[in-house]
Regions:
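Metal-dependent nuclease catalytic cores that hydrolyze phosphodiester bonds in DNA/RNA
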Residues: 1-92
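Mg2+/Mn2+-dependent nuclease catalytic core
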Residues: 74-116, 125, 130-226
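Conserved pre-motif I regulatory segment
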Residues: 244-287
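A substrate-engagement module of RecA-like helicase motors
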Residues: 247-251, 255-258, 310-419, 424-427, ...
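Walker A/P-loop
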Residues: 279-301
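Signature of the SF2 helicase/ATPase Hel1-core->accessory helical subdomain module
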Residues: 298, 325, 401-418, 422-530, ...
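A contiguous, basic/glycine-rich beta-loop/short-helix subdomain that forms a polymer-engagement track
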Residues: 394-414, 419, 430-437, 538-654, ...
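Conserved RecA-like P-loop NTPase helicase motor core
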Residues: 651-663, 715-828
C-alpha cells in the first residue's frame, strides 16, 4: 500500500511539533556562547533521564508521571498539533502552603519558592496581578523537571523557556478539559478539582548532587494562560503559513516540469530506478560512467518524489566542495525551468565565519552577541526573499542582521526542501544536524550520496577515535594546580596507557602495533577514560572563563570522542596501539567496517542512493555501507562510442617496490614522453605518491625535455588559488603540449571537469595500492577472516578505485577524444581485469617501444 500523501486533497495539512521544540524556537534569546552549555545541554539530557526517574519514583499520592498531552488547533489552512509528555501532574489541596505541593520528603537542600495567597512573590514577573484563588477545591499542578549542571540553590527564578514548556502543558490541560487527568481516575470516581486555575511547578535538580532541588511554583487562570498560549501558537503559525504557501507553489511548479534534456543512452533507466527506490523505501547503488548525466538522473526523480508527497526533503551529500558545485548546478538547471524549491548549500563554520577565526562567544564575536534575539527575523526575511541559498547569500544576510552566518544557515536549512552538504552533516555522530538526525528523530528524507566511493574512508574516520598518551600527560600538567581530582584521574589513565606502551616496546618490527583483545584491560581503560572525562566536564563547568580552557579544549573533544566511541563499539572495531608520527603512544578504536553505523543513520531517512562513476565491485561497497540484504544496483552503460578512446596497458612496467629504480623510472618517463609527442594537447600523469612522481619527473626533465612540451607538477600543499592556477594551464586548443604530473587520489584525480581539448590523455602509473601499514594490515586480517578476500578489501579495491577515478578525467562529452595509458603489468592479472569497466574491454597491451605506433593509429582515425 502506498504511503503517498494526497496532494490533491482539500483537507488542511497537519503540522506536528513538540512542546519543547515550539518554545525553544519561538522564545529563544541571548548570545551564542561556546564557553558554556545552555542549562540543558546534551550531557544534562543524558544524565537528566536518570534524575527524572528518581524524582518521579519518589512521588507519592496522586502524582502521575510522564503524562502524554496533545492539542490540535485548526489554523485555517492547516491544523497544528502541539504534543509532548508532562513530567508529572498532581493535585494540590492547599495551594497557599508549600508542603501541600510536595508528596515526598523534602531534603534539607531543597529550596521552595512560592507565590503566596496575598500575591507577593520573591521572583518578579512570574505571577503578577493574578486574582486570588476563590475555588477551594484541589488544584491540578504540572511538574516540569530539569536536571542541570549547576548548584540549583543559586537559582532565583526559572529559565523562561523551561517555564514556557510547563505552561504549554498546563494550557493543553485547560483546552482538553483535563481529560488526561480525569480519564486516569477510577471509573467510579468523580473529578474533584478546580477547573479555572492551574498550578505550574518548575523542579530543578543538580545533576552532580541530585539531593539538591529547587522548586518554583506559580499559578495561572484559564483566560490568561490560554491567551498566552495562543500568542505562542500564532507566532509559530506565521512560519507554518509561509512554509505551506511555499510548498503549494513548489508542487504547482512541478506540474509542467519535465526532464530538462533529451535522455542520453541509459539515462531514463537511471531516473526510473532512483524513483522506484524512493517509492519502495530502499537503497540503490548506482554506477554511471562519465557522460551519462548521473547527477540530474538522481536529482530529478528525487525532486518529483518530494513534490508528489513521497518524501519531505533531499540531502545531497558529498565529500568535496567541487562535487557540491555539481549538485547545486543540477538544482539550478531545474530552477531555470520553473522549479520553485528552496535549496541551501551548507558551508563549514571555518569557511563562512566573517571573523579571522571562529570564536563563538559574545566577548570575541559581535555576531554571537545577541544572535538569538535577531536570528528568527533574519531567517524569515531571507525565506521571503529567496529560494536559493549559497555561501554568499547566507553571509550577506547574516551581516545585514548581525547574526552568525553558520548558525543562521542551519536554521534556514530547517525550512528548505533540499540541503547540499558534506557527508558529516548526515552521518558523523559528532557533527550531524541534530535538528534532523538527533537521537530518536526520523523523517522522510532522501539521501543522495555523490562520489560514494569516498564514503569508505570518510566513514571509517567518522566512527573511529583515538587518544594519545602525551596528550593525557599534557592535560594533567594544565589541571594539576586547578583540580587535584582531575589530575589524579588523568594520572590513572596515563598509567593504563604506560602499561600498554611497555608491552608495545617489546614488539619487533619497523612499525610495531599491538591489538588489544583482553576485556579486562579494555574495561579498565574505558573506566579510567570515563572518570577522566567526567572530571574535565566538572572542571569546564566550574571554570567557564578560565584561560586554561583553551589549552584543554582539543584534548577535551579528543577524550569525549574516545569515550563515546568506546561505549558504542562492537565487533566491527579493532582496538590497537601504535606509535604516531611523533613517536607517541596512540590508542586507537578503529572502525574497520562502518556498515552498521552508517545504516543506523540511513534508517533515520526514507531511502538512499549511492552513486559514482566507480563503484566496482559493487558488493564491496554494499558490505561497507549497509546491513540490509535487499539492496539494488544499476550499472549504466556509457553513452560514448568506443572509437572515442583507446586504453593501453604497459605490460613491461612494474611499480612494485622491488622493481623501482632509475631504469624503471626512465621507462615510465619515456611512456609519458611518447604519449605526449603523439598528438599536441593536454595530458595528466598520475602517480601513487609524491616521491614516485618526483623521481620520475627528475628523469623526465633531464632526458625527455622537448621545446614544444611544457610540464607542471602538483605540490603537497596547494590552496584553492594554487589549484585554480594549476588547472589554468589546461586550456582549449593549446599551441604547445602540456603535461601535468599529479598524484592519484589527490585533488586533480577526481571532481575536475576538463572537457574537449583541455585534457586528451591520462597516464596512470601503478595500481594505486595503499602502502603497507598498520591499518591496511588490520583491514586485511579482518576481511580475510570475514570474507576470505582480505588483500582485495584492504589493497586492490581501494587502489583500483583511484585508478578508475584518475582515468575518468578523460572523455567527458560525446565530442571528446582521448587516450588512457595504464602502466603496470598487474593490470593484466585476472583480479584487475575483473575491475575494468565495461568501456575498457578493448584494451591494448603493449611495450614502451610500441606505444607510439598504437597512438599514431588511434589519432589517425580521429
Amino acid at each position: 500500500m502506498s504511503d503517498k500523501k494526497d496532494i490533491v486533497s482539500t483537507e488542511p495539512e497537519l503540522i506536528r511539533i513538540s512542546v519543547r521544540s515550539l518554545v525553544e524556537f519561538i522564545l529563544r534569546s541571548g548570545d551564542i556562547d561556546n564557553r558554556t552549555g545552555s542549562g540543558v545541554d546534551t550531557e544534562a539530557m543524558l544524565a537528566g533521564g536518570r534524575v527524572h526517574r528518581k524524582i518521579q519514583k519518589g512521588k507519592a499520592g496522586d502524582y502521575r508521571a510522564e503524562v502524554p498531552l496533545a492539542w490540535e488547533m485548526d489554523r485555517g489552512d492547516f491544523v497544528l498539533r502541539v504534543e509532548g509528555r508532562a513530567d508529572g501532574i498532581f493535585t494540590d489541596a492547599h495551594p497557599s502552603k508549600s508542603e501541600a505541593y510536595v508528596n515526598d520528603t523534602i531534603s534539607e537542600d531543597t529550596i521552595y519558592m512560592d507565590k503566596d495567597a496575598e500575591g507577593d512573590d520573591d521572583r518578579p514577573g512570574l505571577c503578577d496581578d493574578r486574582p486570588r484563588l476563590c475555588d477551594d477545591r484541589p488544584r491540578l499542578c504540572v511538574d516540569e523537571i530539569k536536571g542541570i549542571y549547576m548548584d540549583v540553590r543559586e537559582l532565583t527564578e526559572p529559565q523562561e523557556v523551561h517555564l514556557a514548556q510547563a505552561k504549554c502543558y498546563a494550557a493543553i490541560l485547560f483546552l482538553t478539559d483535563f481529560a488526561a487527568w480525569d480519564d486516569s481516575l477510577p471509573d467510579d470516581t468523580e473529578p474533584e478539582h478546580n477547573r479555572e486555575r492551574i498550578g505550574v511547578r518548575m523542579t530543578y535538580v543538580d545533576l552532580e548532587h541530585d539531593d539538591r532541588i529547587n522548586m518554583f511554583d506559580s499559578d495561572y487562570g484559564r483566560e490568561e494562560l490560554l491567551a498566552w498560549f495562543d500568542s505562542i501558537v500564532e507566532r509559530y503559525s506565521l512560519w507554518c503559513r509561509h512554509h505551506i504557501e511555499h510548498k503549494r507553489k513548489r508542487d504547482a511548479s512541478m506540474g509542467p516540469l519535465t526532464f530538462p534534456f533529451e535522455y542520453r543512452t541509459g539515462q531514463k533507466n537511471l531516473v526510473s530506478s532512483v524513483y522506484r527506490t524512493i517509492l519502495g523505501k530502499q537503497e540503490l547503488f548506482l554506477m554511471a560512467p562519465t557522460g551519462v548525466g548521473k547527477t540530474l538522473s538522481v536529482v530529478y526523480p528525487s525532486v518529483r518524489a518530494v513534490g508528489q508527497g513521497y518524501a519531505d526533503m533531499i540531502f545531497y551529500l558529498t565529500a568535496k566542495n567541487q562535487t557540491l558545485t555539481v549538485g547545486a548546478e543540477a538544482f539550478r538547471i531545474l530552477a531555470d525551468r520553473g522549479l520553485l524549491m528552496k535549496t541551501i548549500v551548507l558551508t563549514s563554520k571555518e569557511k563562512i565565519c566573517p571573523m579571522n577565526e571562529p570564536s563563538c562567544n559574545p566577548d570575541d564575536c559581535p555576531y554571537a552577541r545577541g544572535h538569538f534575539d535577531r536570528v528568527n527575523d533574519a531567517v524569515f526575511d531571507l525565506l521571503e526573499k529567496k529560494d536559493y541559498f549559497d555561501r554568499d547569500v547566507i553571509l550577506t544576510q547574516a551581516k545585514e542582521w548581525n547574526v552568525c552566518p553558520f548558525e543562521m544557515g542551519l536554521d534556514v536549512a530547517s525550512w528548505c526542501d533540499a540541503v547540499l552538504c558534506d557527508y558529516n552533516y548526515a552521518f558523523d555522530p559528532k557533527a550531524h544536524l541534530r535538528r534532523f538526525f538527533g537521537e530518536g528523530k526520523k523523517g522522510d528524507y532522501i539521501f543522495l550520496v555523490d562520489e560514494a566511493h569516498n564514503l569508505v574512508d570518510r566513514a571509517r574516520e567518522m566512527y573511529s577515535a583515538g587518544i594519545v598518551k602525551e596528550d593525557v600527560l599534557a592535560a594533567k600538567k594544565v589541571v594539576k594546580n586547578v583540580s587535584r581530582s582531575a589530575a589524579r584521574a588523568l594520572e590513572r589513565l596515563n598509567k593504563e596507557l604506560l602499561a600498554i606502551k611497555k608491552e608495545l616496546l617489546l614488539v619487533d618490527g619497523r612499525n610495531p602495533y599491538l591489538v588489544l583483545t583482553d576485556s579486562t584491560v579494555l574495561g579498565r581503560i574505558q573506566n579510567e577514560a570515563l572518570r577522566a572525562f567526567g572530571e574535565l566536564q566538572i572542571l569546564f563547568r566550574e571554570h567557564r572563563d578560565a584561560s586554561f580552557r583553551e589549552e584543554l579544549l582539543d584534548f577535551y573533544f579528543e577524550i569525549s570522542d574516545f569515550v563515546s566511541t568506546f561505549e558504542g563499539m562492537d565487533d566491527d572495531y579493532v582496538v590497537y596501539a601504535d606509535f604516531n608520527e611523533e613517536e607517541h603512544l596512540s590508542l586507537n578504536l578503529f572502525c574497520v567496517n562502518p556498515a552498521r553505523n552508517l545504516q543506523s543513520m540511513i534508517d533515520r531517512g526514507r531511502s538512499a542512493v549511492f552513486f559514482s562513476a566507480t563503484l566496482l565491485p559493487v558488493d564491496y561497497y554494499k558490505k561497507l555501507f549497509t546491513t540490509r540484504e535487499e539492496t539494488y544496483a544499476v550499472y549504466a552503460r556509457s553513452p560514448f562510442a568506443s572509437e572515442q578512446k583507446v586504453v593501453i596497458v604497459g605490460s613491461d612496467v612494474s611499480t612494485r617496490y622491488r622493481s623501482r629504480g632509475a631504469s624503471m623510472y626512465r621507462k615510465i618517463a619515456r611512456y609519458i614522453h611518447d604519449t605526449a609527442m603523439a598528438r599536441r594537447g593536454n595530458y595528466m600523469a598520475f602517480f601513487p605518491s609524491y616521491k614516485f612522481m618526483t623521481d620520475v619527473l627528475s628523469i623526465y626533465r633531464t632526458e625527455f625535455d622537448e621545446a614544444d612540451i611544457n610540464w607542471v607538477a602538483q605540490s603537497r600543499y596547494m590552496n584553492e588559488m594554487d589549484r585554480e592556477i594549476f588547472l589554468e594551464n589546461f586550456y582549449e586548443d593549446p599551441e604547445m603540449t602540456m603535461v601535468g604530473f599529479c598524484v592519484m587520489g589527490g585533488v586533480f584525480a577526481e571532481g575536475i571537469d576538463l572537457v574537449g581539448s583541455r585534457l586528451i590523455g591520462a597516464i596512470v602509473v601503478g595500481c594505486g595500492l595503499p602502502q603497507v601499514g598498520t591499518r591496511t594490515e588490520l583491514l586485511r586480517t579482518y576481511y580475510e577472516e570475514k570474507t576470505g578476500d582480505g588483500f582485495n578489501y584492504a589493497y586492490l579495491y581501494p587502489g583500483m578505485n583511484k585508478v578508475l577515478q584518475s582515468a575518468g578525467r578523460v572523455i567527458r562529452t560525446d565530442q571528446d577524444r582521448g587516450v588512457i595509458v595504464l602502466l603496470d603489468d598487474r593490470f593484466l592479472t585476472a583480479d584487475c581485469l575483473r575491475m575494468f569497466p565495461r568501456e575498457w574491454t578493448e584494451y591494448v597491451p603493449c611495450k614502451v617501444d610500441q606505444v607510439r605506433a598504437v597512438l599514431d593509429r588511434f589519432w589517425e582515425g580521429v
